[in-house]
Swiss-Prot record:
Gene Ontology BP term (one): immune response
Organism from which the protein derives: Paralichthys olivaceus
Signal peptide boundaries: 1-21
Principal location: secreted
Top-level taxonomy: Eukaryota, Metazoa, Chordata, Craniata, Vertebrata
Protein name per Swiss-Prot or TrEMBL: Uridylate-specific endoribonuclease
S-S bridge residues: C25-C29, C25-C41, C29-C59, C39-C41, C39-C52, C45-C51, C52-C59, C66-C70, C66-C82, C70-C100, C80-C82, C80-C93, C86-C92, C93-C100
Cofactor entry: Mn(2+)
Function: Endoribonuclease that cleaves single-stranded RNAs at 5' of uridylates and releases a product with a 2',3'-cyclic phosphate at the 3'-end. The UU and GU sites are more efficiently cleaved than CU and AU sites.
Assembly mode: Monomer.
One MF annotation (Gene Ontology) recorded for this entry: polysaccharide binding
InterPro entries to which the protein is assigned, alphabetical: ENDOU, EndoU-like, EndoU_C, SMB_chordata, Somatomedin_B-like_dom_sf, Somatomedin_B_dom
This protein's UniProt keywords: Disulfide bond, Endonuclease, Hydrolase, Lyase, Manganese, Metal-binding, Nuclease, Repeat, RNA-binding, Secreted, Signal
EC number: 4.6.1.-
Length: 385
């Protein structure tokens, strides 16, 4: 599957960086206030009168393509539509047939379930940064039935993570990932306002995970050959927007993103929301901020990565089932969720890891968009029985 020319292309294109015009909303819709730009592209700009001149066209009702919008819910503000009913009402976007009349997940040639399973096996084999049995030791303890997951009973007297080798977490992708985890307010309703340093940390993580690993380059090569992206620059920028672009989960505040929800975790309505990452679990458990109660699922894998569904409290806030891939590298987690979201947005995505099936459930954020009507990631997680 690897193509030498593609790797050369990747290096060349990455050097172009993430370039945006300072006075345009192209590729910036919904992103948090950034003083490095001369104008802004989120809902707050309407209140503060500092929107870019193309804000309405780019961010509100200007979507004229179905790329990234297949099967989206009807929105009367959109100029054209990309769901199964648009043909009946004669209001499909002009590229609906080319992009959505297949199960391709967003453009180019059809991406079949077999394609996804095949590339997930390749990514699994390429995860050279995953934990080994000597670098990570877990202590699952109490296994509960699905009917008991809401009981909020602490059935495990010891932490889940018995030992994690510190040198594992100092590797470049782990270090870059940890740097981003510290940048969020966990309570929904609190505005996320990033400093230039924090924005730089987001880009560093994407670079380390996707451009500086063979695993990340393989994911791009797959999506490139399927026609989903025309260049690595487009791929990296889209990852940045779908994962780090901000939207509002509560009270019209720009308080959330796919990355925060899935990897860092949030508190909403008095309970834990999201939180599907083993590294965040470990660091909070080590600090005494997280109390592991039990698990309701432990996957069939006998080496890392494994998959678990866990019950726990985070500073007193309960999570009934927090599923996560355990012991994988940050780039593997990021790549699997990205693969599934890009190819199966809002659906179940069937992967194969070492010959064993893993189902990832993805959800799209349907209230706001970025770019030409593309949707942010709302959630993605292992679907455990």
């Amino acid at each position: 599957m690897k193509v030498i020319a593609l790797l050369t292309l990747c290096v060349t294109l990455f050097c172009q960086g993430y370039s945006n015009s300072l006075d345009s909303c192209q590729g910036r819709c919904g992103y948090g206030t950034d003083n490095n730009f001369s104008c802004q592209c989120n809902t707050s700009c309407e209140r503060f009168k500092d929107c870019c001149s193309d804000y309405a066209e780019q961010c509100k009702a200007g979507a004229t393509s179905c790329k990234g919008r297949c099967d989206e819910k009807y929105n009367s503000q959109n100029k054209c539509h990309c769901n199964s009913k648009c043909s009946r009402y004669n209001n499909c976007c002009s590229d609906y047939t080319d992009i959505c009349d297949s199960d391709a997940g967003g453009g180019g040639s059809v991406i079949t379930d077999a394609d996804i399973k095949a590339v997930s096996e390749v990514l699994y084999a390429l995860d050279s940064n995953k934990a080994t049995a000597s670098e990570l030791i877990i202590d699952p303890q109490a296994l509960v039935h699905d009917s008991q997951t809401s009981s909020q009973r602490d059935l495990s007297s010891r932490p889940l993570f018995r030992y994690v080798d510190g040198t594992l977490l100092s590797r470049p992708t782990y270090a870059a990932f940890l740097a981003v985890l510290d940048n969020y307010h966990r309570m929904t309703g609190q505005v996320e306002d990033f400093s230039p340093q924090q924005l730089s940390e987001q880009e560093t993580f994407i670079k380390e995970a996707m451009s500086n690993t063979e695993l990340g380059r393989e994911l791009f090569a797959f999506l490139y050959t399927k026609g989903v992206y025309a260049s690595e620059n487009e791929f990296l920028h889209d990852l940045k927007m779908m994962w780090f672009g901000l939207y509002s989960r509560y009270n019209n505040k720009m308080d959330s993103s796919g990355f925060e929800h899935i990897f860092a975790g949030e508190i909403k309505g008095g309970k834990v929301s999201g939180f599907h990452n083993w590294i965040q679990f470990y660091r909070l458990e080590k600090r005494g901020q997280l109390n592991y109660y039990s698990h309701s699922f432990n996957g069939p894998w006998t080496t890392f990565p494994d998959v678990m569904g866990m019950q726990f409290k985070w500073d007193g806030y309960f999570k009934q089932v927090g599923s996560a891939v355990i012991g994988c590298s940050p780039e593997f987690d990021f790549a699997l969720y990205s693969l599934c979201y890009i190819t199966r947005p809002g659906k179940q995505c069937r992967l194969s890891l070492g010959g064993k099936e893993l189902i990832i459930q993805t959800y799209t954020w349907d209230k706001t968009t970025y770019g030409n009507g593309k949707k942010f990631i709302a959630s993605a997680f292992p679907s455990t029985p």
